Structures are given as structure tokens and as C-alpha cells.
Design a protein with these regions (language model features):
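Long, low-complexity intrinsically disordered regions
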Residues: 66-82
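Basic/aromatic-rich interaction segments and small domains that mediate binding to polyanionic partners
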Residues: 2-70
Length: 82
């Protein structure tokens, strides 16, 4: 993986959930270095809304995907707000 790659979180873990990030959310790698297996990933929302989080995600907890749809992140957020 490298900076600017689009990724999807493939696990549900408490440490990510505390940041508001859940399985299925999509983000992009926003730092060019991997530190001890972790990449800094930004999870945004659609349009001009504030980002959900920018947090370190272990490379085994995500997969690279061809394109991002931030609206997907908003749908997942709503499921956890209920």
C-alpha cells in the first residue's frame, strides 16, 4: 500500500469504533509511511461535511479498493447512532 491508496476497513474493532470508524467504511491513506504495520487513514463524509476520523489502521485490518464512495461511510455511521 502507499499514500493516496483507497482502502476499506474489513474488521470491526473497539479501538477503531472509539474513533467512529466501523467495518465497511472507506478511506484513503494520507501519510506516506507505514509505522509498525499501521497506516494513517482518513475517513471522510460526502460533500463539505467534517471528516469522521483520521486514525492509524493496521494493514491487515483493511483492503485496497479501486474507488471510494464517502456516502457509504455516512450510511454506516447512521447504523451506529441508532
Amino acid at each position: 500500500m502507499k499514500e493516496m491508496d483507497i482502502v476499506e476497513l474489513i474488521v470491526e474493532k473497539e479501538k477503531y469504533a472509539k474513533e467512529g470508524v466501523h467495518k465497511g467504511m472507506q478511506g484513503w491513506i494520507c501519510y506516506d509511511k507505514c509505522v509498525r504495520g499501521y497506516w494513517l487513514v482518513n475517513f471522510s463524509q460526502y460533500g463539505e461535511k467534517d471528516d469522521i476520523a483520521t486514525t492509524s489502521i493496521h494493514e491487515t485490518d483493511m483492503k485496497q479498493i479501486p474507488r471510494m464512495d464517502a456516502r457509504n461511510n455516512e450510511v454506516i455511521c447512521e447504523q451506529f447512532r441508532e
